[in-house]
């Protein structure tokens, strides 16, 4: 198939109608660049939402790589979850041979930047933040691995029932800090920042109007971030939980032993990668380090790594090493990890914090509405006072005209919204009384 015709069968409804989706977006600035293209910050003009657009050049891709692009579009469009980067739309330019993916904008960067920040500050990431991020990633993987939503916790002592697996399950296959994005709470304005005014928006607006030191904390405050799992370009969708993938993909530092040994693998490979990510959050370096790929491969196959620093609890250390387990029979699944009491405690804490923040948001919203209503009441009182004064002046003027013997003119049809009929009776009263 000719490269320019590759995406013809995948045309979106807008393209079929002759209106490409990219015409609805305004590009603000480039925020990243990779081997296949760039990442740009854009505004969806009709809704004025701040989004991200991935510009992917497919002209030099082989058939396998182009199929991965289609797979990413398909997977992202199906995965709707608060801890997964939301996919909005896609489009392509046949002349430039570029595919455009429109996705949620995560304003706090990614987990690798967070780890780098703490490493530069020579500080450990607080354990509460580590548990919170682990709990959020597990809820995202639960959606991927079972194809269903994770039930909300009522209490931390709730016992989960084994999930009824959905039709399709997804293995991410490239779980690493750079693919884990950070944002604010859903009630914040990370993708809903509104732009007042015109369709054309100055890109400096978003440099000057970021949510930073307000109720969400400083730019480097990670205590209230929401984790978003993204970059599903290497993900594989399996029709049933019995199927195993065999393709060799992923990032070496976070790659599971079964992938390295070219063996069939399952969602448990994502658990291994997640364990490596959480280990790096605690130790500020990957669990397996080597001077060359062969040495790294040997270390991963053996599965031997150091414990996390003593700054962290034994419980956290234990759950990390349970995920970095070479034995697939003893490596826990997403469901089993979510049964852990500390994970449940972290989940419940996140639920309560989110509920509290929403209450504060509603309180602030009500306060703002109250201020607006008070301002409007003052304005209405002022206007009413002016109307009363004008009414009194009009009546007195007509009374003076009658007393002086002048002919009373026609009452004006309206004075600032008061119609002539309302003035007609008082004017007639004065006219007959003093005749």
From Swiss-Prot:
InterPro entries noted in UniProt: Kinase-like_dom_sf, NEK_Ser/Thr_kinase, Prot_kinase_dom, Protein_kinase_ATP_BS, Ser/Thr_kinase_AS
Active-site positions on this chain: 174
Positions of transmembrane segments: none
Enzyme class: transferase
Residues binding ATP: 31-39, 54
A Gene Ontology term for the protein's cellular component: nucleus
Sorted UniProt keywords: ATP-binding, Kinase, Nucleotide-binding, Serine/threonine-protein kinase, Transferase
Stored Pfam families: Pkinase
GO biological process: chromosome segregation
UniProt-recorded Gene Ontology molecular function terms: ATP binding; protein kinase activity; protein serine kinase activity; protein serine/threonine kinase activity
Keyword Coiled coil (UniProt): no
Region of interest (Disordered), residue spans: 1-22
Parts forming coiled coils: none
SUPFAM superfamilies linked to this entry: Protein kinase-like (PK-like) (SSF56112)
Catalytic activity, reaction form: L-seryl-[protein] + ATP = O-phospho-L-seryl-[protein] + ADP + H(+); L-threonyl-[protein] + ATP = O-phospho-L-threonyl-[protein] + ADP + H(+)
Function: This protein is probably a serine/threonine protein kinase.
Entry protein name: Serine/threonine-protein kinase KIN3
Organism, as annotated: Saccharomyces cerevisiae (strain ATCC 204508 / S288c) (Baker's yeast)
């Amino acid at each position: 198939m000719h490269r320019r015709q590759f995406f013809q069968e995948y045309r979106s409804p807008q393209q079929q109608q002759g209106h490409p989706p990219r015409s609805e977006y305004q590009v603000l600035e480039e925020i990243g660049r990779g081997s296949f293209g760039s990442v740009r910050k854009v505004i969806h003009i009709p809704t004025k939402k701040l989004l991200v657009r991935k510009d992917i050049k497919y002209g030099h891709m082989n058939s396998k790589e182009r199929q991965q692009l289609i797979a990413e579009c398909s997977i992202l469009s199906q995965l709707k979850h608060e801890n997964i980067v939301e996919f909005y739309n896609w489009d392509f330019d046949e002349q430039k041979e570029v595919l455009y993916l429109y996705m949620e904008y995560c304003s706090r960067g990614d987990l690798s930047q967070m780890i780098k920040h703490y490493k530069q500050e020579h500080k450990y990431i607080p354990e509460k933040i580590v548990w919170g991020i682990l709990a959020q990633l597990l809820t995202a993987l639960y959606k991927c691995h079972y194809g269903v939503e994770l039930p909300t916790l009522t209490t931390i002592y709730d016992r989960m029932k084994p999930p009824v697996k959905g039709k399709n399950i997804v293995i991410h296959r490239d779980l690493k800090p750079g693919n884990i994005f950070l944002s604010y709470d859903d009630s914040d304005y990370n993708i809903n920042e509104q732009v007042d005014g015109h369709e054309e928006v100055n890109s400096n607006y978003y440099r000057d109007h970021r949510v930073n030191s307000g109720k969400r904390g400083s730019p480097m405050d990670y205590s209230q971030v929401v984790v978003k799992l993204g970059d599903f370009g290497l993900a594989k969708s399996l029709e049933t939980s019995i199927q195993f993938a065999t393709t060799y993909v992923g990032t070496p530092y976070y790659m599971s032993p079964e992938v390295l040994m070219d063996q069939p693998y399952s969602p448990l490979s994502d658990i291994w990668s997640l364990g490596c990510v959480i280990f790096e959050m605690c130790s500020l370096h990957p669990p397996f380090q080597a001077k060359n790929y062969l040495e790294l491969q040997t270390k991963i196959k053996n599965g031997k790594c150091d414990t996390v620093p003593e700054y962290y609890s034994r419980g956290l250390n234990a759950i990390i090493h349970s995920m970095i387990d070479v034995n697939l029979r003893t490596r826990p699944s997403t469901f089993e990890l979510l049964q852990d009491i500390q994970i449940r405690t972290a989940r419940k804490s996140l639920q309560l914090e989110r509920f509290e923040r929403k209450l504060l948001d509603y309180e602030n919203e009500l306060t703002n509405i109250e201020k607006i209503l008070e301002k409007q009441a003052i304005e209405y009182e002022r206007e009413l006072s002016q109307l009363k004064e004008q009414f009194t002046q009009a009546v007195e003027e007509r009374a003076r005209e009658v007393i002086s013997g002048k002919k009373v003119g026609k009452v004006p049809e309206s004075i600032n919204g008061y119609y002539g009929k309302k003035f007609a009776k008082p004017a007639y009263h004065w006219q007959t009384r003093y005749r």
